[in-house]
From Swiss-Prot:
<dbReference type="Pfam" id="PF02639">
    <property type="entry name" value="DUF188"/>
</dbReference>
<dbReference type="InterPro" id="IPR003791">
    <property type="entry name" value="UPF0178"/>
</dbReference>
<comment type="similarity">
    <text>Belongs to the UPF0178 family.</text>
</comment>
<protein>
    <recommendedName>
        <fullName>UPF0178 protein Gura_4014</fullName>
    </recommendedName>
</protein>
Length: 152
């Protein structure tokens, strides 16, 4: 079992929560990004620097994550790929992607992208806040507890 983080756009506070959970449960973490990341001081945490380009980090994660791994990503197409391969994906705002909800999330994402392109909608998601952090911490704890129990 490993935790993968789509690290380019992942908030620092989320990475720090994952690092603490990693130490507590002794689960390795791999950060994947197309820019250099500050190194966390733990033998359990590694970083992969991929080439700069559209979906390169996502492709790396999708190709290397195993079904027993957890992927932290806000990228809905990546989450859909992980779920389709039997894996577990969690959004930095605490939403667990499932077979039941990932298709709907993709459809909403695509619609919003079209509406933004047409100038009918402006802006993106709300600013990341305290409620999001709490929701993520709770979802991370529940998900990792379930995954660790299943592993044993």
């Amino acid at each position: 079992m490993k935790i993968w983080i789509d690290a380019d756009a992942c908030p620092r506070v989320i990475k720090e929560m994952v690092f603490r959970a990693s130490e507590r449960l002794q689960v390795p973490v791999c950060l994947v990004a197309n820019k250099d990341l500050s190194k966390a001081h733990s033998r359990l945490i590694t970083s992969i620097l991929v080439a700069d380009g559209f979906d390169i980090a996502d492709d790396y994660i999708a190709e290397h994550a195993a079904p027993e791994d957890l992927v932290i990503t806000a990228d809905i197409p990546l989450a859909a790929r992980i779920v389709a391969n039997g894996g577990v994906a969690l959004d930095p705002r605490g939403e667990l992607y499932t077979e039941e909800n990932v298709g709907e999330r993709l459809s909403i994402r695509d619609l919003m992208q079209e509406l933004r392109s047409a100038g009918l909608v402006q802006g993106g998601p709300a600013q990341f806040g305290l409620t999001d952090r709490k929701r993520f911490a709770s979802a991370l704890d529940r998900t990792l507890t379930r995954m660790v129990k299943r592993k044993r």
